[in-house]
Every structure is written in structure tokens, then in C-alpha cells.
């Protein structure tokens, strides 16, 4: 039935011969999950086990609560509601860094500051950061359960820190990426007013304000008059509307990082024209 796709997938816990032979075809079937034998021998016990499994799955799908999982830390519904906004923020930070850090990394350092350090469980947030960062990698079947293991397989050590050091924001999530001892990328986020209003507010130590979703034209540029007008005219020429703009500079006349939030992806002609101009560097489109 599995081979013919009449049954899409199945999970089994009782077998005619236990333990099952090492070369049994069930062990490698892509649509079959083998679970521990529950040992419910009576009809009543089997019915109650089935009900309990259904309740656990329902709770996870409806509220995010994780109960009795053998490969994921326990997460009750109340804690899930607390960490859920941070999970979205963390995944966005990971996605952003995956698109702006041009090299492989071997260490990810995640700092929980302000009220974030008081969260009862930060593991789901760390997993979300890794999910975002590894989403563009050629990784099959990436999910919250295996993402830590896959990060380790790729040579990425994960460090978490609850910090009580003073920070600018009441709630602070900061991700730093390293290659050896060199920091190759960093991004930080917070919430403006409430968990329903998250923002990315740091990129490579530059203060910015970026929403978690959308298409963004990013580049470094010389800080001089006319840059915003020039880019705006260029985008308008190609019918690309600007939804928002955030920029940061080191000092007047120095270097700047500009982020244009656009309603549609700029065509290649826009990117090529900017790249030909020595005023601009690191021109890229980022999607969150």
C-alpha cells in the first residue's frame, strides 16, 4: 500500500518478529516511521493509547505545545505563546544573515538580552534562527527537530547566552556569525511596543529598521547627496515601487548602508547599473 501510494505514510510500533531484522525493508522505507513498542496489550489500553497520541498531535498542531516528544524538549502552550514572536524574529535574522554573509561559518553565537533573557525556554528560538540560516542550504528535510544536528554536521557550533548586560532595547535578540576568530556577520532584532511589531534593528552593527517580511534592495554606498534620489529614479524607471527606506552611515561623507523595501523584485538591469557605479558595493536583493 505504501509503495503504490494508496497509503501516503504510516507509523508502526508492533511487528511479527521483534526486534526486527537489521535488513528488513521497513527500516529504510521513506514513507514509514518505526516507533517504540508501547506495550498496550489489551483492547482498552490500545484505545487509550490511540486517544492520547491523537490529543498530543492535536495540541501541537493547534497550540504549538510539545508533549512527550522523544527528540524535542517539552514546550507547554503558555511558553509557546511567549517564545512564538521570538521564533519569527529569530528565523528572519537567520534568513537575512544567510543572504548577506558570503562565506561559510563555523560558529553561531546567539544572545538573549533584556526581557528575552528571562524567557523560560530559548531552545525553540535558537532552532528558529538556525532554520532561517540553513533554509537556503542544500539540506533535505530540514525541520526544527533535526536542525541542531544538521548545523553540527555542517561544522557550525551553536552558542547561546542569556545576558543581563544593559541594552538599548527592552527585548533583544542578537545573532553573530564567526569563521574562526573573525566575526563575519551580525544582526539584531527587537519589538516596537508589542510582540506583534517586530523589527530587525541592527545589521553589521549598523542601526536600521527592517520589517521581517518583504523584498529588499541592499547596498553599501558613499555618503553623499543624490544617492537616494538616483536609486529612487532608477527603480521608478523599472516600475519598482518603494515601500520604505532605511539607511545608516558611519559619519557625514563617510560610508553608508542603505536598505530599500520594495513592492517587487528589482530586475537584473537595476542591479547591474548600480554595480557598474563605483559609489555602490555589495549590491544585492534580499527576500524575507
Where on the chain are the PLM-derived regions?
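A conserved regulatory-domain signal marking ACT and ACT-like small-molecule sensing domains
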Residues: 74-288
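Rossmann-like dinucleotide-binding domain for NAD(H)/NADP(H)
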Residues: 1-100, 118
